[in-house]
Design a protein with these regions (language model features):
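Post-His helix in hydrolase/transferase enzymes
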Residues: 264-280
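Flexible "cap/lid" loop of the alpha/beta hydrolase fold
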Residues: 127-128, 132-171, 208
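Conserved alpha/beta-hydrolase catalytic His-Asp/Glu region
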Residues: 173-206, 210-219
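Secretory targeting and sorting signals
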Residues: 1-38
Length: 283
């Protein structure tokens, strides 16, 4: 069963879900602790750019923990934004508000669906000097994550999804998508120990079904230098789709034998690519 089949009943509600603005209760996870680098006007004294991390569907900001630890150890200020997962346009607006609080250059990093979000958010954010796609979507204008996922064979996500209805603020019903708990390890993070993936499954953040079918309105990778980490054992986004997007974006590309949850299983490799991108902002 492909992903399009799994979420087809939600297409007529895409316009409504895309307008959901339930982000007021969402928090910003800043790797710098209470004295957050996200504080307006704050810029650490070091010349290194701020790294802003945007998680994707079926995850939360803690999926970046291993990457954050390494970046901070190397002297980078880091912010891990809480992606609302409601739709690329509204999620990008939220991330854009995070970027406005940062002074100086930014390396913007997106995992999975977060790639769609950073492509939109960076378009109106001149301080973004580099984009890093980590097992991520990099849609062109008019493309959706769903379309790109189904463009090449290999994704088994559709059969692993658990659709859950939720009430919309203005009336009606939307659909959130989770990965079934008994499918999570194999589908999302096969190279992560099962005790860890059990926790990840329990704490996963759902994505609005309509978000995966919402078309991109811009593609920041056309004007901002990009880096791409392709995961060759990925059952969410087919490796062939990742290669297609990376090649089209003329991204500096690295391939790794890893699952979709590469930031958890291989945080060192993710960090190295981010730092490679970051070094270009200080040249």
């Amino acid at each position: 069963m492909n992903l399009k089949t799994a979420i087809r009943p939600t297409r007529r509600r895409a316009a409504v879900l895309g307008a959901v603005a339930g982000v007021a209760a969402l928090t910003l996870t800043a790797a710098t602790g209470p004295a957050s680098a996200a504080r307006a006007g704050h810029r650490p004294s070091e010349a290194k750019p701020t790294v802003v991390l945007v998680h994707g569907a079926f995850a939360d900001s803690s999926s970046w923990n291993g990457v954050i630890e390494r970046l901070r150890r190397d002297g980078y200020p880091v912010i891990a934004a809480a992606n609302p997962l409601r739709g690329p346009a509204s999620d990008a607006a939220y991330v854009h508000s995070v970027l406005k609080r940062v002074t100086g250059p930014v390396v913007l990093v997106g995992h999975s669906y977060g790639g769609s979000v950073i492509s939109e958010a960076a378009a109106d954010s001149p301080q973004v000097k580099a984009l890093v796609y980590v097992a991520a979507f990099a849609p062109d204008k008019g493309e959706s994550a769903l379309e790109l996922s189904n463009k090449f064979p290999g994704s088994t996500l559709g059969a692993a999804l658990d659709p859950v209805p939720f009430p919309l603020p203005g009336g009606g019903t939307g659909t959130d998508l989770y990965i079934k708990a008994d499918k999570f390890h194999h589908q999302f993070a096969a190279d992560v120990p099962e005790p860890v993936t059990d926790l990840m499954a329990a704490t996963q953040r759902p994505v609005a079904a309509s978000a995966l079918d919402e078309k991109a309105t811009t593609a920041a990778w056309k004007t901002i230098p990009s880096w791409d980490l392709v995961t060759t054992q990925d059952y969410n986004i087919p490796p062939a789709a990742q290669r297609f997007m990376a090649r089209r974006a003329h991204a500096h590309t690295v391939e790794i034998k890893a699952s979709h949850a590469v930031s958890v299983s291989h945080p060192g490799a993710v960090t190295r690519l981010i730092e490679q991108a970051a070094r270009t902002t200080t040249r």
